[in-house]
UniProtKB/Swiss-Prot annotation:
Cross-referenced SUPFAM superfamilies: Xylose isomerase-like
Catalytic activity, as annotated: alpha-D-xylose = alpha-D-xylulofuranose
Protein family: Belongs to the xylose isomerase family.
The protein's name in its UniProt record: Xylose isomerase
Cofactor binding summary note: Binds 2 magnesium ions per subunit.
Encoding gene, per UniProt annotation: xylA
Cofactor(s) required for function per UniProt: Mg(2+)
Organism: Pseudomonas fluorescens (strain Pf0-1)
GO annotations of cellular component type: cytoplasm
């Protein structure tokens, strides 16, 4: 049976359209900088917020009455949920989706039940993918919701919990491989601490390092060609999480020799919780060579928690997309909408409104960012700002031709007295705004 009988396939109608369910800017096959818009953006809808979350929060029960969420046999409901999901993906016209293992299959009462349920649902997902042409951007394992993970998964003080996490990640990686997923994500939802009074930081870090090495080894064992991605987040649900931000993740990867093996999946709302801009986190990951993929959403500036709202700022997303284009675009990654409608958005149609608006925001941001790249006044001004480092003296310093003493003697001997030069921040902000608000 159809779950969205009143919704037709969403189509591009152009900026002048008054239809609430039409794309004004997302023209999937429009060529931007030599390739279609859909290939630049690689947009995905997430399973968990869209089809699993019941509209609950810490103060109240779920407000949604989705037809795929009513009481019944767990496996039958999972099968129906998959049908609803792929009907939604197809009508939305989105090319990818993402899931946690327990989003798509009931966990059951034992690891054996979990394995059997998950295996059955992978059969269904594979069939849906073949019939629809929709692809898996990434899969992952939910190693944070089950009470056994209250003190973490890989960082847990109990090695048997560590082993249970390994069982889920093993299963989810194999499923991602079978479904031809482009990436595998590792989000350490409870890899952190509530208090240092009962926490051995060194031990937990070593446990995490060992777990990640096992994941990398398994990637090669099964021949997975996609990227492994850690998703940084500073806190929530724990007080402090070990994958705080992109720079912290890079330091962790370097410690365990994994900086060439694992990249990051950056979420906008996680960046702001860490006290950074989304732009900062993407630029940092690019500069460190670990940029992988994006969870596109936004937080509320007045709230200090993860609100996971749909992205709606062309200004913010243009700067982020500019950084991605300058870095050569996505490899295996893409823009996954880790976003959810509000608890009062009760109609199934609201799911479409949220995604359509967000897809248009990314499309318009891509066009604005592409224009910035083609003009690239920002890059020319950066080149001027750092021009001294391209001169013989600057090159000699970077090449190690000076030590601290000889460089100091050079400064004294030549009576160096360089003058500060304007950073032109206001002018640069005006340049960006001319592209965004043209």
């Amino acid at each position: 049976m159809p779950y969205f009988p009143d919704i037709e396939r969403i189509r591009y109608e152009g900026p002048a359209s008054d239809s609430p369910l039409a794309f004004r800017h997302y023209d999937a096959d429009k060529i931007i900088l030599g390739k279609p818009m859909r290939e630049h953006l690689r947009m995905a809808a997430c399973y968990w917020h869209t089809f699993v979350w019941p509209g609950s929060d810490v103060f109240g029960a779920g407000t949604f009455k989705r037809p795929w969420q009513h009481a019944g046999d767990p496996m039958e409901l999972a099968i129906g949920k998959a049908q609803a999901a792929f009907e939604f993906f197809s009508k939305l016209g989105i090319d990818y989706y993402c899931f946690h293992d327990t989003d798509v299959a009931p966990e059951g009462n034992s690891l054996k039940e979990y394995r059997n349920h998950f295996a059955q649902m992978i059969d269904h997902l594979e069939r849906h993918q073949e019939e629809s042409g929709i692809k898996l951007l990434w899969g992952t394992a939910n190693c944070f919701s089950n009470p056994r993970f209250a003190a973490g998964a890989a960082s847990n003080p109990d090695p048997e919990v560590f082993a249970c996490a390994a069982a889920q990640v093993f299963s989810a990686m194999n499923a991602t491989q079978r479904l031809k997923g482009a990436n595998y994500v590792l989000w350490g939802g409870r890899e952190g601490y509530e208090t240092l009074l009962n926490t051995d930081l060194k031990r937990e870090r070593e446990q995490l390092g060992r777990f990640m090495r096992m994941v990398v080894e398994h990637k090669y064992k099964i021949g997975f060609k996609g990227d492994l991605l850690i998703e940084p987040k500073p806190q929530e649900p724990t007080k402090h999480q070990y994958d705080y931000d992109s720079a912290t993740v890079f330091g962790f990867l370097q410690q365990f020799g994994l900086e060439k093996e694992i990249k990051v999946n950056i979420e906008a709302n996680h960046a702001t919780l860490a006290g950074h801009s989304f732009h900062h986190e993407v630029a940092t990951a690019v500069s460190l060579g670990i940029f992988g993929s994006i969870d596109a959403n936004r937080g509320d500036p007045q709230n200090g928690w993860d609100t996971d709202q749909f992205p709606n700022s062309v200004e913010e997303m243009t700067l982020v997309t500019y950084e991605i284009l300058k870095a050569g675009g996505f490899g295996n990654g893409g823009f996954n909408f880790d976003s959810k409608v509000r608890r009062q958005s009760l109609d199934e149609t609201d799911l479409f409104h949220g995604h359509v608006g967000a897809m248009d925001v990314l499309a318009l941001s891509l066009e604005r960012a592409a224009a910035m790249v083609q003009n690239d006044q920002l890059q020319r001004l950066k080149d001027q700002r750092y021009a001294g480092w391209q001169q013989p003296f600057g090159q000699s310093v970077l090449a190690g031709d000076f030590n601290l003493q000889s460089l100091a003697e050079h400064a004294f001997a030549n009576e160096l007295n360089p003058q500060a030069v304007s950073g032109r921040q206001e002018m640069l902000e005006n340049v960006v705004n001319r592209f965004i608000y043209r």
